[in-house]
Amino acid sequence: MVVLAGPPAVDHIPLLRSPDPGDVFSGVPVVDLGSPGAARAVVDACERYGFFKVVNHGVATDTMDKAESEAVRFFSQTQPDKDRSGPAYPFGYGSKRIGFNGDMGWLEYLLLALDDASLADACTVPSCAVFRAALNEYISGVRKVAVRVMEAMSEGLGIAQADALSALVTAEGSDQVFRVNHYPPCRALQGLGCSVTGFGEHTDPQLVSVLRSNGTSGLQIALRDGQWVSVPSDRDSFFVNVGDSLQVLTNGRFKSVKHRVVANSLKSRVSFIYFGGPPLAQRIAPLPQLLGEGEQSLYKEFTWDEYKKAAYKSRLGDNRLAQFEKK
């Protein structure tokens, strides 16, 4: 989603009950990408939760640490200095306002366009060469993780073509986006039993998103029964979300996961998210290989461009797929 620059106060941002220690979800699926059973584990996690943690992913700790330290340095600048990297229409620096329809959250961010496995040349933010180099090294690594995960999905689903899914994000013109989010501590609510919304509940419209954060918790996912649970933070691992488009490609076998971020009252949270989307003209419909004999598609066919435009017109928490579901 797009976050637009603006300075609304805390009282304009929705409040949530502060996470309780009992809300921590110990059942997050963990996939070891180097294990022989990775493909089956990925499919099982996508079917049950639409969400999982990836370990043994091959991205060096130093690569992740450098990107994080440079992001912290950027967000530590004065507000006028940060504002020179915005406003985000859609790319660049933004703060607080989420989307075009009134959603707000307690965060500031950088939204960046990608060409292949690096920042787009036309994307001049960030201007700092050291920050750009650190991000490009990180993006190259996390994109490889996304490709490996999607190849594991294909294998686990029994699709003969290994890159049936991953080719959608490696194709020329694929719509890849990278986001750096900073959730400052919100001390105004400390001790009141409630927390400010960092980023409101939503699903991601793309195929997959791959997230990594610092050691500060805040990410929550909704289980199938509607219960919200907190995801234990792990700065050495990646977390993968199934997106709406992948839900359609699998005809609902994989479910896009609803998630949100609750701002911490004491510590900053910094997160990096790679969003893997297909080319704008790519048609999105259930893969024929995944439809059983006589099984009908649950969705009307659409292009990624059509779905992306529909997403930008919606509120953050809207069920964007509803208008494409066959009745």
Swiss-Prot record:
Residue numbers binding Fe cation: H202, D204, H259
Catalytic activity: gibberellin A1 + 2-oxoglutarate + O2 = gibberellin A8 + succinate + CO2
Disulfide topology: none
Class in the EC hierarchy, top level: oxidoreductase
Residues the entry annotates as binding 2-oxoglutarate: Y183, R269, S271
PROSITE patterns recorded: FE2OG_OXY
Protein EC: 1.14.11.13
Pfam family, any one: DIOX_N
Annotated GO MF terms: gibberellin 2-beta-dioxygenase activity; metal ion binding
The entry's keywords: Dioxygenase, Iron, Metal-binding, Oxidoreductase
Tissues with expression: Expressed in roots, shoot apex, leaf blades, leaf sheaths, stems and flowers.
Induction: Induced by gibberellin.
Domain Fe2OG dioxygenase, chain residue ranges per copy: 173-278
Essential cofactor(s): L-ascorbate; Fe(2+)
GO BP: any one term: gibberellin metabolic process
Details of cofactor binding: Binds 1 Fe(2+) ion per subunit.
Further remark: Plants overexpressing GA2OX3 exhibit extremely dwarf phenotype and are unable to achieve phase transition from vegetative to reproductive growth.
Family (UniProt): Belongs to the iron/ascorbate-dependent oxidoreductase family. GA2OX subfamily.
PANTHER family cross-referenced by the UniProt entry: 2-OXOGLUTARATE (2OG) AND FE(II)-DEPENDENT OXYGENASE SUPERFAMILY PROTEIN-RELATED
Known function: Catalyzes the 2-beta-hydroxylation of several biologically active gibberellins, leading to the homeostatic regulation of their endogenous level. Catabolism of gibberellins (GAs) plays a central role in plant development. In vitro, converts GA1, GA20, and GA29 to the corresponding 2-beta-hydroxylated products GA8, GA29-catabolite, respectively.
Protein name: Gibberellin 2-beta-dioxygenase 3
Organism: Oryza sativa subsp. japonica
